[in-house]
Amino acid sequence: KKWESNPREWLNTIDIRDVMNQYEVKHPDFEFIGPVPMDFDSKVGFGKCVINELCNIKLESLLEKGKRKLGVIFNLDKHTQSGSHWVAMWAQFPGTETSSDGEICYWDSYGMRPNPEVVVLMNRLESQAKTLGHPVAININKRRHQYKNTECGVYCIYFLTSFLEGRA
């Protein structure tokens, strides 16, 4: 892997997926979706979305499978582009051992607000949670942590794993 010889090399989709899949195994109540492009919700034909798993997400189905924690890592580029910057979303729904309250959290290591596509997803999950009687709070990181252009993937992984490991 390039990053083994070049520590400034960006993590790619496969690197991030490989790490996060290990956490899905370690935490059976955790569902990871991604990494996904920012246009995940866009229709590409025949009623399909760029990322159907996320476009058609149903909180009730996740909860029925015992998945009360959800992590998503997004790239700000569209699926037809090469990739620019990683951001993440964490969602935790009532009934987990770490919290009686639910929350949806957005993370951008530059402290920028979420893109409209992510806001739509967060609102969709919030609405579904409320309908199921599990209201959630939405929290958005506004503090900048990253000042170079090589760490965003690592920050996203750390953000999600901090919740999973009880550090957040």
PLM features per residue range, with description:
Residues 63-167:
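Cysteine protease-like catalytic core of ubiquitin/ubiquitin-like
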Residues 12-16, 116, 168:
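General structural signal for secondary-structure boundaries
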Residues 1-87, 93-104:
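Cysteine protease catalytic domains with a Cys-His-Asp triad
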